[in-house]
UniProtKB/Swiss-Prot annotation:
Subcellular location, principal: cytoplasm
Protein name: Gamma-glutamyl phosphate reductase
Organism field: Acinetobacter baumannii (strain AYE)
Entry keywords, A to Z: Amino-acid biosynthesis, Cytoplasm, NADP, Oxidoreductase, Proline biosynthesis
Record carries keyword Cytoplasm: yes
GO biological process annotation, one example: L-proline biosynthetic process
Described function: Catalyzes the NADPH-dependent reduction of L-glutamate 5-phosphate into L-glutamate 5-semialdehyde and phosphate. The product spontaneously undergoes cyclization to form 1-pyrroline-5-carboxylate.
Presence of the UniProt keyword Methyltransferase in the record: no
Catalytic activity: L-glutamate 5-semialdehyde + phosphate + NADP(+) = L-glutamyl 5-phosphate + NADPH + H(+)
Entry-linked PANTHER family: DELTA-1-PYRROLINE-5-CARBOXYLATE SYNTHASE (PTHR11063:SF8), GLUTAMATE SEMIALDEHYDE DEHYDROGENASE (PTHR11063)
Pathway(s): Amino-acid biosynthesis; L-proline biosynthesis; L-glutamate 5-semialdehyde from L-glutamate: step 2/2
Length: 421
């Protein structure tokens, strides 16, 4: 069986590489034509795709998947409509491929510049959410990349049904149908092959739980665009406007719990802790959020707040639990974030411009926010259209990864007969 999985993955890889050579030179109009044809195919096959999703849902229930996983797995008519709108948004995005920047003459008379080009073949590994299949496929096509999609086994029927519509759209436009391929086996060995096929795959993008991303990071022989977790902070500084701080800290924690840009630790300046903490604690109590606090937090709010341990400062709860710490000022807040955080998204609430700029400069995260919720750390909210993932690494892409994150640059040299002396 291992040999057959290996042969299957080698075939998928070769087909993706061949398709990428065609896609890399496809015009914007041709790529948009393919995406529009995919839109039509999805519309025409909505009933079949939703029926396939129901098969996955029934299997999920019989396998006793938890309610959060089932929620991510489900494709409702409203979510399907949202998928289609996301595809429209990608069609409307400016195509970065072929853009030439930094063009300048050298003393020798040659012109030097940079041209934006596709990465080649993207391998994506993700869990549960079938809409990611379409988001990733559309971004790959628009950016001129072939993509190999390995979704979770719990969403296999949904992903296959969406992939059929994508293939149909590619055929209509005359682009290779293997530009987008869904791995049609639930065998975990397929992941091991995908992340080591350096001859076929140029970058791996894992989206899912920490254990999945750690495995991919440790075993991959290919560059990985990833974030391990989202331990995000909001620091309410002494000069914060509390009319802003209350809704920001409530939204950052309770808007959605199971997402990587939700706040997990609240830091409050000691100068305003006595005033601010009782108000926000009351709002959290209404939402049934469990608080785990430092000794000063517990002194102010009482014993209903559980004692925070060292582990709490490192924890991404993905649920209605929040760690709270009172700090002496901005220096302690920044030190805490840089020590315990995951370099994802961290925010300050303050009316002091100098301290806001200091926070922006010193916090080592992929997104740093002033006077707004951490929940804005998202490709759509940043104007990127859909996103293929979020990166907390510093090489290549950082933060939400949209079209430009799926591209690279090559040097171009324009001459008129010059030779090196």
């Amino acid at each position: 069986m291992q040999d057959s999985i290996e042969q299957y993955m080698q075939k998928v890889g070769q087909q993706a590489r061949d398709a990428s050579r065609v896609l890399t030179s496809a015009s914007t109009s041709l790529k948009n034509h393919a995406l529009s044809a995919i839109y039509t195919a999805l519309e025409n096959n909505q009933a079949a795709i939703l029926a396939a999703n129901q098969i996955d849902m029934e299997k999920g229930r019989s396998n006793q998947l938890d309610s959060a996983l089932l929620d991510r797995l489900e494709l409702t008519p409203a979510r399907f409509k949202g998928m289609l709108q996301g595809l429209k948004d990608v069609i409307a995005l400016v195509d970065p491929i072929g853009e030439i920047t930094d063009l300048a003459y050298r003393p020798t008379g040659i012109q030097i510049g940079k041209m934006r080009v596709p990465l080649g073949v993207v391998g994506m590994i993700y869990e549960s959410r079938p809409n990611v299949t379409l988001e990733a496929a559309s971004l790959a096509i628009k950016s001129g990349n072939a993509i190999i999609l390995r979704g979770g086994s719990e969403a296999l029927e949904s992903n296959k049904a969406i992939a059929e519509a994508v293939k149909h759209g590619l055929k209509v436009a005359g682009l290779p149908e293997h530009s987008v391929q869904v791995i049609e086996t639930s065998d975990r060995a397929a992941v091991g092959h995908l992340i080591t096929m350096a001859e076929y795959v140029d970058v791996i993008v894992p989206r899912g739980g920490k254990s999945l991303i750690e495995r991919v990071t440790n075993e991959a022989r290919i560059p990985v665009i990833k974030h391990l977790d989202g331990n995000c902070h909001v620091f309410v500084e002494a000069q914060a406007d509390l009319q802003k701080a209350l809704p920001i800290t409530l939204n950052a924690k309770t808007h959605r719990y199971g997402v990587c840009n939700a706040m997990e630790t609240l830091l409050v300046d000691e100068k305003i802790a006595e005033v601010f903490l009782p108000h926000i604690a009351e709002l959290y109590a209404e939402k049934q959020v469990e608080l785990r606090g430092c000794p000063e937090t517990r002194r102010i709010l009482g014993s209903s707040v559980k004692p925070a341990t060292e582990e709490d400062w490192y924890t991404e709860y993905l649920g209605p639990i929040l760690a709270v710490k009172v700090v002496s000022g901005i220096d302690e807040a920044i030190d805490h974030i840089n020590k315990y955080g995951s370099h994802h998204t961290d925010a300050i609430v303050t009316e002091n411009y100098t301290l806001a700029r200091q926070f922006l400069a010193r916090v080592d995260s992929s997104s740093v926010v002033v006077n707004a919720s951490t929940r804005f750390a998202d490709g759509f909210e940043y104007g990127l259209g859909a996103e293929i993932g979020i990166s907390t690494d510093k090489i290549h892409a950082r933060g939400p990864v949209g079209l430009e994150g799926l591209t690279s640059q090559k040097w171009i040299v324009l001459g008129d007969g010059q030779i090196r002396q």
